[in-house]
């Protein structure tokens, strides 16, 4: 199995180094790591370049904004037969890739997501994150599986479902897993030790949690595809301009 890791970034200078450093410590080294810069205005690219001699690293720039565009751009240049899409604020433990490879081979999973633990001093944030992981694992056994933050797919599955939908404003990750399920691929939630930063919760406080709940409710009451801005999100997709997104709150 040749594993390509794709990391979409927009202004992630404060966290991307931690992820790349963690990837240098993997017992099973990634075959390829692609950082996709999505119009950053900080030093994300420069900080990523510091790892060019430590990792099989490639840095590219997405031609359009949005997380879906960035992930698809990374997949377009990736050479692996297994693609892993990681948010920049994740910190996997040293056995992350080794555990992933074993579980995928054992269960013949073709697409899905990973369990995560929220790194936070606040118990309410940790409990909220645990709830979301539990919800994801529950939904994996329904016709409507979901995934977020860290996802994977075989190259064949990715190409069959046409990757991530750039027309979606949010929850393109949910849609990605759902499309794979509907295409007949076996979905699996990989149990790993991977920490996720609580920075969005620290920056937005309870608003971040409310946004997640609102997005989920909106998704089920207005259809599973959210194509218009329902709140401000810098990595959102869809047909609106970045100015329109920034003015949405």
Where are these regions (language model features)?
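Short aromatic/hydrophobic "clamp" motif used to bind/position activated sugar donors
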Residues: 83
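Acidic donor-binding loop at a coil-to-helix junction in glycosyltransferase catalytic cores
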Residues: 170-176
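Conserved donor NDP-sugar-binding/catalytic core segment of glycosyltransferases
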Residues: 95-124
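Short beta-strand/loop segment that forms part of the nucleotide-sugar
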Residues: 30-39, 60-63
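Glycine-rich, basic loop-to-helix element that forms the pyrophosphate-binding segment
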Residues: 62-78
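Short, well-formed alpha-helical segments that are part of the catalytic scaffolds
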Residues: 11-25
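A conserved acidic beta->alpha catalytic loop
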Residues: 37-46, 90
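Short, flexible, basic/aromatic active-site loop/helix in glycosyltransferases
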Residues: 113-149
């Amino acid at each position: 199995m040749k594993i390509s890791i794709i990391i979409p970034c927009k202004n992630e200078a404060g966290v991307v180094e931690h992820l790349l450093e963690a990837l240098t410590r993997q017992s099973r080294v990634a075959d390829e790591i692609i950082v996709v810069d999505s119009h950053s205005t900080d030093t994300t690219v420069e900080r990523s370049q510091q790892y060019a001699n430590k990792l099989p690293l490639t840095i590219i720039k997405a031609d359009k904004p949005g997380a879906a565009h960035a992930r698809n751009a990374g997949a377009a240049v990736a050479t692996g037969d297994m693609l892993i899409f990681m948010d920049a604020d994740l910190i996997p433990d040293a056995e992350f890739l080794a555990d992933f490879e074993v579980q995928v081979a054992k269960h013949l999973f073709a697409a899905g997501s990973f369990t995560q633990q929220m790194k936070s001093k606040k118990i309410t944030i940790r409990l909220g994150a645990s709830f979301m992981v539990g919800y994801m694992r529950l939904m994996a056994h329904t016709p409507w599986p979901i995934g977020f933050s860290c996802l994977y797919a075989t190259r064949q599955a990715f190409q069959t479902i046409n990757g991530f939908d750039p027309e979606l404003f949010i929850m393109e990750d949910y849609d990605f897993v759902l499309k794979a399920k509907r295409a007949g691929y076996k979905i699996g939630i990989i149990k790993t030790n991977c920490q996720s930063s609580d920075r969005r919760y620290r920056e937005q406080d309870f608003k971040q949690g409310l946004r997640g709940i609102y997005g989920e409710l909106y998704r089920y009451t207005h259809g599973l595809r959210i194509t218009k801005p329902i709140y401000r999100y810098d990595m959102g997709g869809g047909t609106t301009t970045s100015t329109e997104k920034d003015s949405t709150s």
